[in-house]
């Protein structure tokens, strides 16, 4: 699938001391040559594979106002990117953890959808071996570990302004303060909560199976069906469609799954992004804490794994051979 770059600009923020971030602005746009296209394709791939949160612009968002003017042809893309980088520097300066980086703005098209991607990338040093087998220093953009990135679906934003999912951003690993400063710069707030939608789906599936009075084996088969469909959508980069999922579960009950969720008021969207970590709960139980990590297939509950809620005790019958071997060696050694 081809990625077509419309316009791309790079600027830089350099941290000179604890108080100041120096602004270095390009005087021209980047030429979208083969190297630039390859870089953007890699950034698009890395970003698309990561878990994202969804948002929308606030009414007073300066970035949204400037972007709207740029899209209407009242401002050049380069001028838009330069002004936005200045606002980013001002926002970053409020935080003691502020670091510099390469600031990227790229307007591109992928699969007939227009996007604006904004990222702060680290420019790192490394070593390479040249053709004479000498070691030389080199610099590279750390795209694989990019975590300050947001992407606006311009097509969705302009055709469906009431949407709560046209803006996506990375959330989690970078920490709340970093996420907060970037959201402040974007002038955005969280919109669709994909995790909540997936949790609601899991609850609806269990309730649907219970309403159909399925036995344990049948309930687990339903969960497996749902997981298989959702995982297929996830791998294809597609959203979970309630109507399609309902067709997958046809025959489970006289009432369709889509009808059941609507009647019971689960407030599920007609389509929403799949969340990998939440969906795993359909087929596995997992948890960790206090030096203990446990992970087992859901079908084993009640067969080899038993939980007593009164005493909060988990009993496992038949330990994995490698674990049993470790336990035997440790206990036989008297330690």
UniProtKB/Swiss-Prot annotation:
Subcellular location: Cytoplasm, Nucleoid
Keywords, comma-separated and alphabetical: Cytoplasm
Gene Ontology cellular component list: bacterial nucleoid; cytoplasm
The keyword Cytoplasm belongs to this UniProt entry's keyword annotation: yes
InterPro entries: Nucleoid_associated_NdpA
GO molecular-function terms, A-Z: double-stranded DNA binding; single-stranded RNA binding
HAMAP family in alphabetical order: NdpA (MF_00730)
Record family assignment: Belongs to the YejK family.
Protein name: Nucleoid-associated protein KPN78578_25800
Phylogenetic placement of the source organism: Bacteria, Pseudomonadati, Pseudomonadota, Gammaproteobacteria, Enterobacterales
